[in-house]
A protein has these predicted regions:
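Generic C-terminus detector
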Residues: 462, 468-533
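Conserved alpha-helical substructure of the radical SAM core
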Residues: 63-84, 94, 98-208, 212-221, ...
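Short glycine-enriched, charge-decorated loop/helix-capping segments at active-site entrances
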Residues: 147-153, 243-250, 315
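Short, compositionally biased leader-like segments
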Residues: 19-42, 415-447, 495, 501-506
Length: 533
């Protein structure tokens, strides 16, 4: 680990410009030193203390990738952004041209990241639209990017308006995910799911900790009727893991009960583990093996812990990244999956997301990239001639290697079957229902936080928070820049005003959501870290 001269992530590792400047004062005249890093590129980021937009350098050092930036008020910061420099630099070939939405919602006025969204500067449409229907939760996790707690409940009418606007901007939206807070405790979550399914939206997901599914028979019956894909919080098996990450050491039996009930109800599940350094990285392999064996689970979405919202103190130079999780998968599954099985996702910025698919037949696990050279079809830099059926296979692979791919869905299975036609996997005799039992997906998603925020990545983000006034804000901007805090404050005030209006018989006309970053920056500078209504 590099030597740090300051605390709290502001340290100057050996080789940094500040370190070398200080060392130069001690160096004999006439001698020079080479930096121990390669300057790779310049981007824009934010100060983790005051959220000011500042320049940031991307550096390659010790086979890893770091971000270095300096705030004129708060000094230098460094953070690990990718634990494999070679994979990071080669990922650019997977950078697919973006898809333009049917229309934008905001104009360019202040510049990225303060014009969300989506504004015309944004380079990708919304593959996944996330609706946070409430801020309340039935858990109090120490690690919670949403900082869940008392606040607001969206109304069914508001959610229907959000869905209609999403259809207007996307035409045929691919995925809507209901989130929170804990969306399962919203009293109208079932009508909300029905509203999404009644519109031209391909897949509807419910992001949940599973508590209500484990304990509420009537809710489980209602959920089984509408059949959303369940995006299921599952961080491992050790009590200590859940004590540190979720604040409840003995929650595993409840989660296993929920998964078994989902299997009996026929609802597809994607496990979503948050992986924190020195907490549960040792459980990655066991999670993979469990997912393959459990009848409800069609895939896993590993998410290296990011530090926005509510989180413990952390060392930004020691954070988990996608290559760290892939390495753990390889080491802990005895080669069932290796690093070469995972391919960056082209629709977002390629270092944000990696995916692999495997054909499962008994004890045999065969990752698709071992029998089909995915690079031949997803390399957007090299001008390659595709083989026969190449365009059809390319289209199928682009669908699989997309942030909107839903494990176990009919569309994903069809695309997998087309890909298999090029590599001889034994799928031809299976219908899609049977094929679902043989296809397993592992995704890895690394989100930005105030330490790793990269404007280049943000501008191609395809996961957007959908708000009641029509704004679609990239997920990482919503969590890092100050949108979440301002939106929550205004939505909470809006709910109180609605209640007062209903009590007095006054027609309630909700004011639009507005975002004031000059005021936010000033509030942060004063050390309050909160936003006015």
């Amino acid at each position: 680990m590099p030597t740090l001269l300051l605390l709290r992530g502001k340290g100057f590792p050996e080789g940094s410009e500040q370190f070398m400047f200080e060392q130069s004062l001690k160096t004999e005249v006439g001698t020079k030193q080479d930096a121990d890093y390669v300057f790779y590129e310049l981007t824009r980021s934010i100060c983790p203390e005051c959220l000011r937009v500042i320049d940031a350098q991307i550096l390659l050092r010790d086979t890893k990738v770091f971000m270095r930036k300096r705030c004129p008020e708060h000094g230098f910061f460094e953070a690990l952004v990718y634990a494999d420099a070679q994979a990071y630099t080669s990922a650019s070939k997977y950078n697919k041209p973006g898809t333009i939405p049917l229309r934008y919602t905001t104009a360019i006025e202040h510049g990225c990241p303060h014009d969300c969204g989506l504004c015309p500067d944004h380079q990708q449409h919304a593959c996944v639209g996330i609706i946070e229907v409430n801020s309340a939760c039935n858990m109090d996790c120490p690690l919670c990017f949403a900082d869940a707690g008392a606040g607001f409940n969206l109304t069914l009418e508001e959610v229907e308006g959000i869905l209609d606007h999403f259809v207007e901007t996307e035409g045929h939206p691919e995925v809507v995910q209901f989130s929170g807070g804990e969306p399962s405790i919203h009293p109208q979550i079932i009508p909300m799911i029905k509203a999404a399914k009644a519109r031209d939206i391909q897949y509807v997901m419910l992001n949940t900790n599973g508590k209500r599914i484990a304990n509420d028979d009537r809710f489980l019956e209602q959920l089984a009727e509408v059949q959303p894909v369940i995006y299921f919080q599952f961080d491992g098996f050790d009590a200590e893991t859940y004590r540190i990450i979720r604040g409840e050491a003995n929650i595993l039996p409840e989660k296993l009960r929920a998964l078994d009930r989902l299997a009996a109800s026929g609802m597809p599940v994607v496990l979503v583990p948050a992986i924190e350094r020195d907490v549960n990285e040792h459980e990655v392999g066991r999670i993979v093996k469990f997912g393959i064996e459990h009848p409800a689970v069609h895939g896993i979405n590993f998410q290296p812990a990011f530090h926005a919202g509510r989180h413990a103190e952390h060392d930004p130079l020691q954070r988990m990244t996608i290559p760290d999780v892939i390495r753990s998968i390889e080491e802990q599954t005895d080669g069932l999956f290796t690093s070469t099985d995972f391919v960056p996702v082209p629709c977002c910025f390629p270092t944000c997301n990696s995916v692999t698919y495997a054909y499962i037949d008994g004890d045999t696990v065969l990752p698709l990239p071992r029998v089909l050279n995915v690079d031949d079809y997803l390399d957007y830099i090299t001008n390659r001639v595709l083989p026969d059926l190449g365009n059809e296979i390319k289209t199928a692979l682009e669908g699989l290697w997309s942030s909107s791919a839903v494990p176990g869905s009919a569309k994903t299975l069809q695309q997998f079957a087309i890909s298999c036609a090029a590599c001889g996997l034994p799928d031809g005799s299976l219908d899609l229902g049977e094929l679902a039992d043989h296809v397993f997906t592992i995704m890895l998603q690394d989100f930005l936080d105030p330490w790793t925020f990269n404007q280049k990545n943000l501008m191609k983000c395809c996961k957007e928070i959908l708000l009641p006034d029509g704004k679609q804000i990239p997920f990482c901007a919503y969590n890092s820049v100050g949108y979440r805090e301002q939106a929550r404050s205004q939505l909470t005030a809006r709910q109180l005003a609605r209640v007062r209006a209903e009590r007095t018989g006054v027609v309630f006309n909700p004011p639009p959501l507005t975002f004031n970053f000059n005021q936010s920056l000033s509030t942060y500078k004063n050390g309050k870290k909160e936003w006015p209504n």
